[in-house]
Amino acid sequence: MYDILIKDAIIIDGGNNAKYQADIGIHNGKINKISKNIDAKNGKRVIFAKDMYLTPGFIDLNSHSDTFLTLFTIPNQDSLLRQGITTILGGNCGSSLAPLVSEDGLKAIQKWTDPGQINLNWLTFQEFLDSLKKIKIGINFASLVGHSTLRRGLIKDEFRELKPKELKIMANMLKTAMKQGAFGLSTGLAYSHAKMATTKEIVELAKIVKGFNGLYTTHIRGEAEELIPAIEETVDIVKKTGVNTEILHLKAMGENHWPNMKKAIEIIEKNKTNINFDIYPYTVTGSVLYILLPDWVAEGGKTQLLKRLKDPSIKEKVIREMQEKKSYEYDKIIVATSPINRAFIGKKITEIAKAQEISVEEAIINLLLISEGRISIFLDTLSEENVKAGLAHKLSFIASDSAGYNIKYYQKKSDLVHPRCFGAFPRFLNKYVEKEHLLGWEEAIYKITYGPAQKIGLKNRGLIKKGYRADLVLINPNEIADKGTFENPYQFPRGIKYVIVNGKLAVDNEQITGEKAGQILKRA
């Protein structure tokens, strides 16, 4: 007797193979049988799936549910399940929740959320995983080690290169975490506290990851005028170490830099290194407000940043540099979160400046001072053509760069989250696959299932194959669509009919069940 029997589904198996029709029997959390004409009497629960696509559960290799802390505050991760995500990889962009050398390691997540909202009662990576097991979560979770978490925990807010002894300590901490189940290392080299990390420092740590056959993911040093040097640095790291590498959310920000996207991909292709990259299906990105400032302003951390901006002479210098450089199109930047003054949420930076009768640059500085540096923004700065080229490229995977939420979160707060938190994968499948035929369904599903599973190093997930874990998604291809907007992102998508996590129904006919069947995954 099967726990769940799915009848007459069109199977897209995740391996970029041709579709076929079959029944699937699920028992004890695994795919037990794939065959035609399994008697419906053999299923405790039978789902009739005629004309629907059955795929492996989607694997999001660029998630921030851990460092945004929603994995704890919203453990069912409704918005991810409703878009078909069954497994996420956390610890990205240089920030993870373990291992912690000191409480300073957690400062790396302050730009996104308040660490004080949960009780962090761990230090080691193993203790972190053990704590997660106690709360029960709706999706499978794997994690990298954040480079900035290690670095900041060790030298706090000091803006300098590491001493040899400090690098050795970091290396030993990384080794221990890898032994305890971490899947690899991530860097956030664009953020202020990692800017002083040398290529040599990253190379030494990447060698350790390579020794464990782990994964190195990187938010590269720059995505505008710095894009090409940042790509070249990544290629250099891979050539020196051979480490399996993923460039997170590859993009060229700002119209002046759009041609660099093609150049960046050509550099990756030409060098034939073990590098992939991920793309999200939007031209609007999200970040923190302070990235609009010259790099030197953020040196030494938030305290130093605010201290500098309060100094009238330094403030004047910052404004002058911003006006001379003109790196961003300010009329395309919207305030997404503003914890202290919520009246700014949803407004363009230019609107705020106009209302106050000051320059946009001064408005940005004032916003940072009022909010104590904790404002996030949306930037409409990407090229649609570049997004398409990235999505269709043979080296790309699709990732959300998001966190999991639910509708109740919006009822408590007025913050705007990026709509990718609710609809990245349905948008990709609807807009770029079903409607625009940018790529076929088989290749598209590979890019969000077995491809990421192989890249991360997940075992027995990402394929519809006998003996594999029963993480599955049933899709109505005629209905699939995202609904969230930047004005109202808190809307679940259409067309993801059923989601099964480890053999349990997490979404039943587009309704969240609250089953919480997710598992904490460790590197084998």
Where are the model-predicted features located?
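Active-site neighborhoods of metal-dependent hydrolases
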Residues: 132, 138-140, 144-164, 170-191, ...
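C-terminal cap of metal-dependent C-N hydrolases
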Residues: 311, 389-396, 400-401, 472-519
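Di-metal (Zn2+ and/or Mg2+/Mn2+) metal-binding site signature of metallo-dependent hydrolases
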Residues: 53-77
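Histidine-rich, glycine-flanked metal-binding segment
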Residues: 1-5, 10-57, 74, 482
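Divalent-metal coordination cores built from histidine and acidic residues
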Residues: 71-183, 271-273
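Divalent metal-coordination and catalytic microenvironments
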Residues: 9, 29, 51, 62, ...
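Acidic, glycine-enriched loop/beta-strand segments at the rims
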Residues: 11-23, 375-382, 386-387, 436-445, ...
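Divalent metal-binding pocket/active-site signature
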Residues: 176-233
